[in-house]
Amino acid sequence: MEPRVRTVCFLFFLLRVLAEPAKNSDFYLPGDYLLGGLFTLHANMKGTVHLNFLQVPMCKEYEVKLSGYNLMQAMRFAVEEINNDSSLLPDVRLGYEMVDVCYVSNNVQPVLYFLAQEDNLLPIQEDYSNYVPRVVAVIGPENSESVTTVANFLSLFLLPQITYSAISDQLRDKQRFPALLRTTPSAKHHIEAMVQLMLHFRWNWISVLVSSDTYGRDNGQLLGDRLAGGDICIAFQETLPTLQPNQDMMPEDRQRLVSIVEKLQQSTARVVVVFSPDLTLYDFFREVLRQNFTGAVWIASESWAIDPVLHNLTGLHRTGTFLGITLQNVPIPGFNEFRVRGPQAGPTHQRSTCNQECDTCLNSTLSFNTILRLSGERVVYSVYSAVYAVAHALHSLLGCDHSACTKRGVYPWQLLEEIWKVNFSLLDHQIFFDPQGDVALHLEIVQWQWDLSQNPFQSVASYQPLQGHLKDIQDISWHTVNNTIPVSMCSKRCQSGQKKKPVGIHTCCFECIDCPPGTFLNQTANEYDCQACPSNEWSHQSETSCFKRRLSFLEWHEAATIAVALLAALGFLSTLAILVIFWRHFETPMVRSAGGPMCFLMLTLLLVAYMVVPVYVGLPKVSTCLCRQALFPVCFTICISCIAVRSFQIVCVFKMASRFPRAYSYWVRYQGSYVSVAFITALKMVTVVISLLATGLNPTTRTDTDDPKIMIISCNPNYRNSLLFNTSLDLLLSVAGFSFAYMGKELPTNYNEAKFITFSMTFYFTSSVSLCTFMSVYDGVLVTIVDLLVTVFNLLAISLGYFGPKCYMILFYPERNTPAYFNSMIQGYTMRRD
């Protein structure tokens, strides 16, 4: 025998044994088609099933659960409203049969009763396609554990089951529960609404309390998975003990509650999320009141978010602010009056089963009627819409028109197919089932109020599952000093530009450290590390972005630039005047003794060098860098080489010609002075090319060591080494020129240039060494100014120091600029030597 057949045989036996009549027509309404209803009118949290005695639990022995009766009345109201509506199921009367399931204790017997036929028989068949059970569909029950138990039976027969408040995500599995649908959003939407609420108020440090049943464990796990690696951390999670109604609390349970509340007191988390049925929480909150734990924010799951009995607990308002996640309020016209209507008198229904009585339900409802009326219809609407979903499916299946329907036998699988297709408007809300069998009703965040003139569960925000965020957020009356928003953070939020340094194992616990200058914090990329700014950007301390560094270069509006430019202009004009004077007196001995044609080469190159001075000012470019690194050094080197060669040539004429006549003849014959200058020029050009290849011509930037916000832009990234390399030849030439000039200090006065050459060469040598020294200790834009100033002074030293005295003699002592005077000076020198 197959396992399914053995199971059905056992259930058939159990059904026959447990059937029992009851006298209460409020649970039964005859009709052409019956709906089954499973509601919790009494609650037994332990869920004990007396299989040893084969007895169905007597629900009336347990405490009344007010909300269950309220939901049962909603089903009765919906059925009666449909029966009075001529447009929906015309000429068809819906009936119902409802059973109290005692929360989780009494699930098997009612579902067997609904699956049985009119004779209480559940036949064993191989094919149930043509089987017609007692009811066409089942509404309920309310919690996930009971729904799972019932669905395992009903799915075997494809009997439609619509639950109104079970949110477990496991129920979305249509392979396991093909006949189960829900008129409430799934648990993931409830969890997401909670998370969005905590994110909105920046609560990132929470405590979580869960019940020990499947509901608490599953939802606690879902919340933990949702928060894993996110911005919200769970300080601790505890499991609440499950208490037996109508019995004294066991010592271990009492101690467990005391320990949990003490842990809440000691924790810095001020937000407490509670996943638990309402009945488990009464003793817990009594312990909270006993220990005077106040100032917390309690976030209630949908199972107790609008529980009127818990709300009525004396002194509960002192414990803090209560926020709950629940279904959107949809007013149902006429339901408030129907809810408190007494049961109709009628004869005993012989086919009724057990657990169809609740003698105190109506009185309890009357005592809480004000709260129920003000709190609105939330889960009530889920029951209401579930009944209407079955009615619309039945309307389609029976082929109803405006006046009549074709009454016939309805097989469960046929009705199930039609329920999946329904899409109708009910009180301005569209009802249809998604592929997982859920209706996407909106959720609301409610705050508990204790002002009798207001709604005890005041809506403060709404959540739309399809959009995934809160909206219509209203002000909340916080139970804090000055109505300030409670703070629940392991660590305070870091200020802008501060990185997080983790402390401990929780990502929400950290230290805030300022990002140092030159770095910034990109929170979207990595909030635990400061990133370095790009080389052309900078930042101050504690910044989230970098700014462009100010480029620093020599500009025309600066006083130093203007002063140097005036000196360069003076030098240019002076050199030009010297060139004119030398040109007009070209045939004189003074000009020829100074070098003759070579003087014009030097003066021309000096003019070019003066014209290169402006390229030191302004934003460096490739062209200006080429002039600074190539044109000017070559011009200046030629000038120095001419002076050095001229000094050597004079010494040779007067001191070495007689000793080395052949060498001197070669020097004169082959224009040794010009060859030497050409050779030195070629050598200089080689060094310049090597320097350019090594450093490049593109301007580069470097950080100002005194002010990192400034980027110094220059032509040479390694300007110190480049300067030393480029000036090394010039320094050697200056030393050589100085040496030859010193050797000729005893020459005739008109040929003795030792003082002038010594001045020029010594000035160049000392200024170049000073510039290199200055560069070694300073790295700012002032280096460019000093470099330019030294360059101009060196040019002036040659222009005025070397050529100036000669112009002075030409202009003011023309009698000394004659061949006779020069010959007399040479004869006097010769006579002194002899």
Curated annotation (Swiss-Prot):
InterPro entries, sorted: ANF_lig-bd_rcpt, GPCR_3, GPCR_3_9-Cys_dom, GPCR_3_9-Cys_sf, GPCR_3_C, GPCR_3_Ca_sens_rcpt-rel, GPCR_3_CS, Peripla_BP_I
Record-annotated membrane-spanning stretches: 562-582, 598-618, 631-651, 677-697, 723-743, 756-776, 780-800
Main location: membrane
Keyword Signal: yes
Topological relation to the membrane, as annotated: Multi-pass membrane protein
A GO term, aspect molecular function: sweet taste receptor activity
Keywords in alphabetical order: Cell membrane, G-protein coupled receptor, Glycoprotein, Membrane, Receptor, Sensory transduction, Signal, Taste, Transducer, Transmembrane, Transmembrane helix
Glycan attachment positions: N84, N292, N312, N363, N423, N482, N522
Extracellular side: 20-561, 619-630, 698-722, 777-779
Signal peptide: 1-19
Entry's localization field: Cell membrane
Pfam families named among the record's database cross-references: 7tm_3, ANF_receptor, NCD3G
GO CC annotation: plasma membrane; sweet taste receptor complex
Cytoplasmic face of the membrane: 583-597, 652-676, 744-755, 801-834
Family: Belongs to the G-protein coupled receptor 3 family. TAS1R subfamily.
Subunit structure: Forms heterodimers with TAS1R3.
Stated role: Putative taste receptor. TAS1R2/TAS1R3 recognizes diverse natural and synthetic sweeteners.
Protein name: Taste receptor type 1 member 2
Provenance organism: Saimiri sciureus (Common squirrel monkey)
The encoding gene: TAS1R2
